Amino acid sequence: MLTIVFMAYSFCYIFILQSDMLAYLQHVLSEGHTTYNRLVGSLIVVFLVFIIHAAVSAITRLPEKLYAFTFLPSALFLAVLTDLIADYSLCKLLIYLAVLVLTVLLYIKTANSASSQRRKSDSTSVYISNVLILCVMMVVVGLCGNSNDKQHYELKMERLLNESKYEEAVKVGAKSLVSSERLTCLRAFALSKSGLLGEKMFEYPVTSTENALLIPRKDSTHMIFHPDNIYKYLGAFPGETSTSYQFLHLISSQPDLLKSRPQIKDYLLTTALLRKNLDLFASEIKRFYDFSDSTLVLPKHYGEALVLYSHLRTKPKVTYNNTLTETNYKDFVEFSEKYKDRLTRANAVRQHYGDTYWWFYYYGKVCK
């Protein structure tokens, strides 16, 4: 019974919680030449866990009340696989070696004690003792495994993008405040594939860096989603010295390419917004939209940016008239003025306007 419980736990732990981490590990070790299968990989790990337990159980003679300790090497294997191998450090290695040494010493002491005191144990106490020991082991394995939210979000999003599940990819980590440069790039790709980059980009946590929405091609060895997928989607590859904006501006200036790849426009405009360069954004957006059209309705974040721009500039290059957006901006300003402390204001405003470009412009960080 204990064996079935631990094997079921091992499968769920690997398949549900750590499969993306193992996929990344296999990708790195094979230099991208093999692909990880979640079901097959999980079954192989469970089989190895079972073999380790069976071997330990066969060569050890522990008292009945301590039988669950035969699962300790298997638990240690799971912890090492999902923590040490995936995220190596000397400190972690020393800790696991110490646990291994303590396990051997504990076995020697327990075995000697058992040989000198052999008596029948109550079946109920034996069962309870083993269940408690096994539960503690499973909890410890869960605590030891890689629990870096950022890394798990990135890997899960990469897997979903490889499977062309763009709507699911967008939702990864959506309710968390965790963000990174890579997460921002991956989510932008998923949103663009769904036609929502200008509409929803700033509804999620974003990290703005020099690369903006483009992942350097050299990062391919550390990703299961190849950066070239983004460049193929845009229809061109950047030069070694060009910045993300220079690259996007260049390809947006090619009429035929822009016509066949309209997503270039959104990448360019969103890049300007991520850099908080409203003047650049205003000069670029005029190339793509006819502002003489009174019925023009822009994607949400573009409209928010232009309303903000018109309030920050005495002579704006372009104006956008949208009553609803204008009203929302005034409410945003009035609400912000209620708080004097910047940190308190940022947190309070996030609760009501965290899904707007305005919040990012005033409180989001732009990394150099």
Residue ranges and their predicted role:
Residues 64-118:
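Membrane-embedded alpha-helical segments of integral membrane proteins
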Residues 1-72:
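Membrane-anchoring hydrophobic segments
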Residues 9-14, 72-83, 136-141:
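Aromatic-anchored segments of alpha-helical transmembrane domains
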